[in-house]
Amino acid sequence: MKRMLLLAAALLVGGAAFAQRLSVATNVLDYADFGTLNVEGDVAVARRWTLTAGTKYNPFLYKADTPEPLSARQRLYAAGLRFWPWHVFSGWWLGGKVQYQEYNRGGIRSAVTDEGDRYGAGLSAGFTYMLHQHLNVSVGGGVWGGLQRYTVYSCPVCGMTEESGEKTFILPNDLTLAISYVF
């Protein structure tokens, strides 16, 4: 029994000592999507693996020269894993995650507005370049798919429903030009 406790303590302490490497990142390209705020955190759990969690938030409604406001509002939460063939926070990576998004988008190309919830999983890949011991730049892209519950309205403010329901989707995701700080 004592040996098992000693072994468990050694594994926990050894893992905790390595897991103190973490990074915090923000995707610059998301700010071009109507000012979507975003943050992502990674924790190294092994030499080639990181746990990733991120969120995006856009509460903004824009008034343009058109009678209808522009909206690209969203709340997104994601959690997943990344595999780094060489070493964490440096070089190529492959990722997988589960994701939830609540969205409201409309008035951009037409007055039609759609809102709803999306649940799904995604795959992504990219490359991280070390600028400095603590500063990285990442580029990448991916796709995600799953189930979407939605409602389509005639205009952003009128509330006239055109369509609603559930459907599956596949969308581009994680178009990334991120700046990250590694602790």
For every predicted segment, state its role.
Residues V43-V139, A178-F183:
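Gram-negative (and chloroplast) outer-membrane scaffold detector with strong preference
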Residues R21-V24, L61-A64, G106-S110, C158-E163:
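Extracytoplasmic loops and strand-loop junctions of Gram-negative outer membrane beta-barrel proteins
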Residues M4-V13:
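Sec-dependent N-terminal signal peptides
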Residues D30, L70, D114-G116, T168-P172:
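Aromatic-acidic/polar surface patches that form glycan- and anion
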Residues V13-R21:
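Sec/Tat signal peptide C-region and signal peptidase I cleavage site
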Residues H132-F183:
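Predominantly the C-terminal beta-signal and adjacent terminal strand-loop region
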Residues S23-E40, N58, T66, V88:
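Solvent-exposed loop/turn segments connecting transmembrane beta-strands
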